[in-house]
Amino acid sequence: MPSFLTWLGGAAALISVAGCGQAIIGSFLLSRFRWQERRPPCPDASNLPAVTILKPLHGDEPLLSEALESVCRQDYPHLQIVFGVQSTEDTAISHVRALQARYPTRDITLVIDPQQHGINRKVGNLINMYAFARHDVLVISDSDIHAGPHYLRDIVRTLESPQVGLVTTLYAGLPASKTLVREMGAIQINHNFLPGVMMSRLLGRRDCLGATMALRREILEQIGGLEALVDHVADDAVLGHAVRALDLDIALAPCLTWTTIGESSMRELLLHELRWGRTVKNLEPVGYGMSAIQLPLFWATLTLLCCHDARWAWVFFGTVWLIRAMTAIGVNIATAVPAWAMLPLLPLREWISAAIMVGSARGKEVAWRGQTLHIERHVPVTNLRQPLEPGD
């Protein structure tokens, strides 16, 4: 009669097989997404609506100048760029001043305002910046996001549909340098998160990915403005929830962006991932638990530990590793972020991810830029600062 360990190893193997299937499908969907990322004939510039892009800043960070400059290099004619900080001593100011000098013809505004509006300082910063936004199409973009020159055109084209209330973009991890810690951080995003997002969209989920959030001013005002988000840690999730309550869709722009992976120590990386894990777990506990399927090498290793005397377990582990490596190569090509040296470390990366999931199971507090914040579940739309009614 099979022992408990044999049963456990068999169950882990089944989950690992499902994880391999998810990795293959997710990698294929991502590659297809990039292949379809074509440049249509550029429309007449006079037909493009004016856009205000809001970039909240907080201190210096690796590749900050490069990320901010990618906004200044947009192939978009009617563009206002608003940067915001909350202290005159903020080290990000020097980067903005340099861009203003380098791009004198660009409409670049720097807002320095210490006023706080709630627990979410990023949204508080955005509230201060919003007062200077002149245009009706608004794009909120994180400070560490690198974008191609057609980023705004792709977003605006997607937002043109009357059924679309919010546009977001995929993002890949871009290591600020070739260090083990930063490569590990990029693997988590590129090989686990990205294929998982593609798979979830195939199954019908329409989440707001907070690195880019674009919407029309009228929609923002209907949901209660930025003030409706300022008392929530997961402002992107709350915004997406509110837009869907208006019976509007969350669309994905046909472009990929890149987020800087700038952690300098393993402790810093683990705390970052733990913060992200706890946030997602508290917002979507079932979905977060199901995401464990994205770790086929973890489950294959568990199979090997339970059935180490069985030859099939070793063959199975090697096969899963090979499949995982092949899908990782496909993702590397699709994201244009080479990480070939990390392929032998994929099992270690997945065990770290599993440990993060276990650590995320308890606790509703996260550390973020010097703050300790409490994460809440999705609030009902009626609890936002202004009630929402579909069709308003």
Protein language model features and the residues they cover:
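Acidic donor-binding segment of Leloir-type glycosyltransferases
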Residues: 68-117
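Membrane-embedded multi-pass helical conduit in multi-pass membrane proteins
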Residues: 4-7, 14-17, 28-32, 290-367
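Acidic donor-binding loop at a coil-to-helix junction in glycosyltransferase catalytic cores
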Residues: 232-238, 253
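Long helical/loop segments within the catalytic core of UDP-sugar-dependent glycosyltransferases
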Residues: 98-131, 135, 154-223, 227, ...
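Acidic donor-binding/catalytic loop of UDP-sugar-dependent glycosyltransferases
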Residues: 91, 141-158
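Cell-envelope/extracellular polymer assembly enzymes that use nucleotide-activated donors
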Residues: 49-52, 80, 238
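N-proximal low-complexity "stem/linker" segments adjacent to membrane-targeting elements
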Residues: 1-69
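Short beta-strand-to-loop acidic/aromatic patch adjacent to the donor-nucleotide binding site
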Residues: 126, 135-146
